Amino acid sequence: DCDYTCGSHCYSASAVSDAQSAGYQLYSAGQSVGRSRYPHQYRNYEGFNFPVSGNYYEWPILSSGSTYNGGSPGADRVVFNNNDELAGLITHTGASGNGFVACG
């Protein structure tokens, strides 16, 4: 079930919800994992028009279906706010430099 498409990766709403839950759990505990210390603040330099406001945080969502645990984050991210509301999915796939584009 393809609720979101990031490049060639397909994600169901439940996979997105699971990833968001894992990321928010660490955020609310003040913890992070990996070299880039996820979840970390996402400043929305790209100017995406997210359906929720707030301070945004990015967390890797893995096409393998596994929960991110500190290894390679891949290209795809779940973005949530400090109230645990989903802002959307973004990806480095198809973006220039270190930028992001919205997932479909």
UniProtKB/Swiss-Prot annotation:
Keywords: Disulfide bond, Endonuclease, Hydrolase, Lyase, Nuclease, Secreted. It is found in: Secreted. It catalyses: [RNA] containing guanosine + H2O = an [RNA fragment]-3'-guanosine-3'-phosphate + a 5'-hydroxy-ribonucleotide-3'-[RNA fragment]. The keyword Disulfide bond applies. CDD domains: fungal_RNase (cd00606). It is an enzyme of class 4 (lyase). This is Guanyl-specific ribonuclease Ap1. It comes from Aspergillus pallidus.
